[in-house]
């Protein structure tokens, strides 16, 4: 990192921070919603100002990521995506939660954060893409809703292939649904046991930390999105302490501080950032390239079968 970038990191929190995400009502998927909720909860817990901007191509604005690629945070000249990189940026700004925690507590907390993110994100992706009813009735319609035919079909094909690849990397793709639900249940048991040890409302006492934010993001997403299959929701509802935590965070940080003043439409703020604009313009090219690769692969398979 050069000297100018280092100095920018040390500057105060910018006033024009924008959080990009897909449309909540029509488009956002389960795992994406969980990640976006977790980031919003963390920023609100830090009492940091930001604007929420919903747009159809939020995923294509992302500079990268190892799971959902969302949300995308633009803070001045910096662009970050997903929960951990965004939280690390907040820490560099000196605005993070948990400064009061001991070092061993921070290390322990990061272990719980990793467990939560890896287990619940994979479970959300599995339910969304590997359970046929959920995919047909929820995932595919929402993922393709912002694209005209046949781009919606192409986009669904690309998204399904990406999800299966990620599930394969984490060795979740070939699991049975009962194995997935067992892992979710075990994760919730571990989290509830940790919450029971706390003397306060949150995992580490009377003040929130990033574990509270990420647990809220995933569990509240499972509870609030209307999936055709309610297996995940039923599991979460068994853990009363976790349910209580989610409802408290929702009321304290989302209901009391209405998001209406923070939400902005896609046309209310121009895209002045060159990197964001460039990524937006690349959307059509990306979809076209993926479509051509899929077409050529299918054509080659047909030729091989004929031979």
Write out the residue ranges for each language-model feature.
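Pan-eukaryotic secretory-pathway lumenal catalytic ectodomains of glycan-active enzymes
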Residues: 237-307
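A diffuse structural propensity rather than consistent per-protein peaks
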Residues: 81-82, 209, 272
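Short amphipathic alpha-helical interaction elements and helix-loop-helix interfaces
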Residues: 23-25, 45, 49, 79, ...
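Acidic carboxylate-rich catalytic motifs and surrounding loops in phosphoryl-/glycosyl-chemistry enzymes
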Residues: 52-59, 206, 259-269
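GST-like fold's C-terminal all-alpha helical module
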Residues: 122-247, 307
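GST-like domain detector, emphasizing the conserved glutathione-binding G-site
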Residues: 1-157, 203, 276-300, 307
């Amino acid at each position: 990192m050069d000297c100018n970038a280092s100095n920018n990191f040390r500057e105060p929190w910018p006033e024009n921070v924008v959080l990009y995400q897909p449309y909540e009502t029509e488009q956002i998927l389960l795992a994406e919603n969980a990640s976006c909720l977790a980031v919003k909860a963390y920023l609100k817990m830090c009492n940091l100002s930001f604007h929420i901007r919903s747009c159809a191509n939020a995923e294509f604005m992302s500079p990268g990521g190892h799971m959902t690629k969302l949300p995308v945070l633009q803070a001045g000249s910096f662009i970050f995506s997903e929960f951990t990189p965004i939280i690390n940026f907040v820490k560099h700004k000196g605005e993070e939660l948990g400064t009061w925690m001991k070092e061993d507590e921070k290390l322990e907390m990061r272990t719980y954060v990793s467990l939560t993110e890896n287990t619940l994100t994979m479970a959300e992706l599995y339910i969304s893409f590997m359970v046929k009813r959920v995919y047909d009735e929820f995932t595919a319609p929402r993922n393709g809703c912002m694209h005209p035919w046949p781009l919606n079909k192409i986009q669904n094909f690309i998204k399904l292939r990406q999800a299966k690849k990620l599930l394969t990397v984490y060795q979740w793709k070939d699991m049975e649904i009962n194995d997935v639900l067992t892992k979710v249940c075990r994760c919730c048991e571990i989290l509830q046991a940790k919450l029971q040890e706390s003397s306060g409302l949150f995992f580490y006492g009377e003040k929130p930390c990033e574990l509270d934010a990420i647990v809220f993001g995933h569990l509240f997403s499972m509870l609030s999105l209307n999936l055709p299959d309610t297996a995940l929701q039923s599991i979460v509802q068994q853990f009363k302490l976790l349910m209580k935590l989610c409802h408290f965070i929702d009321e304290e940080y989302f209901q009391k501080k209405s998001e209406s003043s923070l939400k902005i439409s896609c046309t209310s703020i121009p895209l002045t950032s060159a990197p964001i604009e460039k990524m937006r313009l690349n959307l059509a090219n990306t979809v076209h390239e993926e479509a051509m690769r899929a077409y050529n692969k299918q054509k080659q398979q047909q030729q091989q079968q004929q031979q």
